[in-house]
């Protein structure tokens, strides 16, 4: 790990540009908090810019995060062990996000931003899928306009109204970092996916850039809420 001294590399998170990752992450977290996605310090966000990874800290109320709370990693960097990760800025008295290796898994696949939320709708659809399809089932929905907000895959354009969206679901673990292997396996099994649900936990969503990751996260949450209501009304998620 890099030798980080007090105050070293603070310039990496100091900018008047609202589009700078150190300013965007607090803004995103405040937005997500207003949706109820990152309550109780849960969830997080990370942005890749050039060879730097900017990551929200662990254990800080997401609506209160400030630029000086942001961690910065050199990229590429090892996912494991944590001691091998190359932090070039590490705020005093704060811990790195437990989501870090999962964010890195998304960046290794070309993402520019990765978001983790504890959305209640995401949690509920994982339970409904488990009850209806068993633990190996994935979330599927079709013939809903908002599906157009989700990419078909890298360089394949956006999904259409008649397409069936599929989001893999992995089982939760006692510790966040232990989800990494299952997340990567889901990415391999569903190479075109931009999201992975975690049963009884939430969702990881990534995109080519911040705007795409944010709008895809919003579109998915809309679809999950709609799916829960459709199920309550006895309506199928996939139109035959």
Curated annotation (Swiss-Prot):
A Pfam family reported for this protein in Swiss-Prot or TrEMBL: Aldolase_II
Catalysed reaction equations from the record: 5-(methylsulfanyl)-D-ribulose 1-phosphate = 5-methylsulfanyl-2,3-dioxopentyl phosphate + H2O
Instruction: Tell me how the cofactor is bound.
Output: Binds 1 zinc ion per subunit.
* Location(s) in or outside the cell: Cytoplasm
Q: Is Protein transport among the key words of this record?
A: no
**Signal peptide range in chain numbering:** none
Residues binding Zn(2+) are 116, 118, 201
GO BP of this protein: L-methionine salvage from methylthioadenosine
Quick one: where is this thing mainly located? Answer: cytoplasm
Q: Which residues bind substrate?
A: 99
Which GO MF terms are attached to this record? methylthioribulose 1-phosphate dehydratase activity; zinc ion binding
Name the Enzyme Commission number(s) assigned to this protein. 4.2.1.109
Instruction: Provide GO CC annotations from the record.
Output: cytoplasm
Keywords, A to Z, come to: Amino-acid biosynthesis, Cytoplasm, Lyase, Metal-binding, Methionine biosynthesis, Zinc
Active site residues of this protein: 145 (proton donor/acceptor)
Q: Which cofactor does it need?
A: Zn(2+)
Alphabetized PANTHER family for the sequence: METHYLTHIORIBULOSE-1-PHOSPHATE DEHYDRATASE
The similarity comment for this entry is: Belongs to the aldolase class II family. MtnB subfamily.
Q: Extract the NCBIfam families matched here.
A: salvage_mtnB
This chain belongs to the protein called: Methylthioribulose-1-phosphate dehydratase
